[in-house]
């Protein structure tokens, strides 16, 4: 038990202490520190028991694991033997190596010599192989250059030159080859730069040309081949998209800037130019290996503007050739649409060039960022530089085509506003343009020997001319318009801006989008366009308009210059119009067209319209006053027309409203003749009452028929102008009120027109209509004033108390003059006014003359039977003249004649006549008749008797009125 306890103690001690040496030290410390021998013996006994226990346990374990232990011991013995053998072998090798070292040390000089000779021979062989390869470089280089595998050629040449200037520098036999390859290396970058420019400016744009040709073929198959605008401004799409990969890269090739410069690999089995993007990357990589990137960038910057100008020249020739092939002659047709075609082509080409530059610029940035160039701080160009040069070239082109230097305006009139007063060119402006029919040739000489030889010669000349550009077109250069060393597709002029403004504005938007400019910043081309239009074009248009209008309004008598028959026929008018009015209306239409063409400046053009119409209104007002004003005083007809009450009354009468309505549209009235007769009576009453018994002096009437004709022409012209301007302005206002669905069909919407301008335009149109109405009223009143002028003196100053003689058989001279004036007016008005207005002038005139003559009875001092006969003849001749004019019997003059025939009776007979025939005239008119009879006849009694007759007259009239009223009431009751 004690042994087991001791063993357990030591096992626990061992388990507590992982280190056996610690246990031994503990036991030794216990034995050495203990003073009692018994304790030591006890400790010793415990140790021995523990060791015995361990031996037993070990024996048991050995018995249990004998096989494994035996295998482990044998394996250990085998490993030990192998290690021992290896040590012995290593020892033997060391001894052998020491022996070899001693032997080699003895032969070291001979071995060193042989080793050096071997190295020298190997180097010589390598040099010989390299020399053989270098000798073949010129031939291989020529093959690579011919096949345009420039990257392989560059690598080959750079490697060869490095060898010749390095290891083979001392080889005298290679000096000529060294010079040759060095020279080729010095010039190779020029070839690469030239190829790069060819792809930048020719290959990139040739795709645009090819696409245009395909479009042209498609359109020629699907449309009428007759010459017409290739590009319709109204249907130009929204801003074009920049060239994408499908537009720029070759079929199956990589898209624009899809790869880095390091990824560019040259395939010797394929056409290197099949993929232009890849080919330009190869060129940049070759230039980088030649360390010519700075020279490349410099060349691109220096040649950029010149290359763009060459694109303009080639495009100009291309457009001219296209027009020539369509059978158009630029010098004859002078079509600005070809300029639009040219600009659209240039926009596409410049976009293609910009896209190509973005590719090249990306490659250049990659080359600068790598170790290919080994250059520091290489300053590249950017896309802003490209767009600036494109804008510069376009500015120069526009400067020429818009004739900003005014090289042509001094000698050539404006194509838009110039026309001769002869009328043919003037009428051509308003003529409807017939659609051009294709001109089918009857025969051609193209297959004759002369034509074949001439065509071959021209083709050879043009091939030589365009061999470098890669854009050989067909057609002679003679189709271009010469101008100061520059060739044009159309005649330069300021009006060309109207055709190209919207497409140019869209391209400017594309440029600003590409440059990332905000709304607050404009590109130079937009600034150029804005300055040109505001500072040059608008002023030039204003000057042209002023010159044209002043040419017809600043004459001595602008109201006498009429448009010719051709112009009237074209305009579809029945009566002559003032040439100045047509010029002004054409100017307004021209400005309205400009407003649509240059929609961004619509306010400026509308302001011009307002100013020109206001000026013309003032001109017409001045001319009107020059006719109707005499010595700071208006003639009576103009004064009455100006009077608001009289003019309002005249316009309220049915004859005025009937004039404004066609006869078939007038409302039908029962007893219309009585209604109109009542209106004539009201008009006559107002005019007679307004004038009174005053005599009209000659200076208060318009005696010159040409003045009346001028007023008639002014009326027709101003009314026509008012209608045309109202139509134009109504279309303008309507165009600003489109629904969203309609707006989607409008390409370039006009900006909203301010209400103030619209109000001004409407007021001007109304003013012209009011002036036209006033002219017509003056004519209407002037004819009637002439009647007053001649017929009032006839009663006041005429002698009708005459005896029967030859003199009594003649017409009164005043009546003859009045008839003459009326006939002259009729002749002038019939030629100058439309029929319904002519009728308005003369209808009702017989009623007025009848009223004047009847009212004039009170002014006769005395009248005899011969005087009555003469008066009746006067009335008859007036009636005859008016009947010939109005083509209707003037029954009102019968009424006047019957009034004077009534004076054949005595005073008492007159009263009996009233009783028998009823009341035909007013009480005042009967009183005037009785008074005149009392003055003219003898033995009719004194004043008392006369008063009795007048009283009897009143009674008769009252009785007749009562009878008439009773009859009327009876009719009503019966109904």
From Swiss-Prot:
MF terms in GO = PDZ domain binding
Reported tissue expression: Expressed in the striatum (at protein level).
Where composition is biased (Basic and acidic residues), the residues are 211-224
> What quaternary arrangement does the UniProt entry report?
The exocyst complex is composed of EXOC1, EXOC2, EXOC3, EXOC4, EXOC5, EXOC6, EXOC7 and EXOC8. Interacts with BIRC6/bruce. Interacts with MYRIP. Interacts with SH3BP1; required for the localization of both SH3BP1 and the exocyst to the leading edge of migrating cells. Interacts with SLC6A9.
One GO CC annotation? exocyst
Q: Is Magnesium among the key words of this record?
A: no
The reply to whether Transport figures as a keyword in the UniProt entry is yes
Instruction: Give the species this sequence originates from.
Output: Mus musculus (Mouse)
Coiled coil stretches, renumbered: 32-114
- Residues annotated as region Disordered? 211-230
Task: List the protein's name.
Answer: Exocyst complex component 4
**Positions bearing Phosphothreonine:** 238
Q: According to the entry, what is the taxonomic lineage of the organism?
A: Eukaryota, Metazoa, Chordata, Craniata, Vertebrata
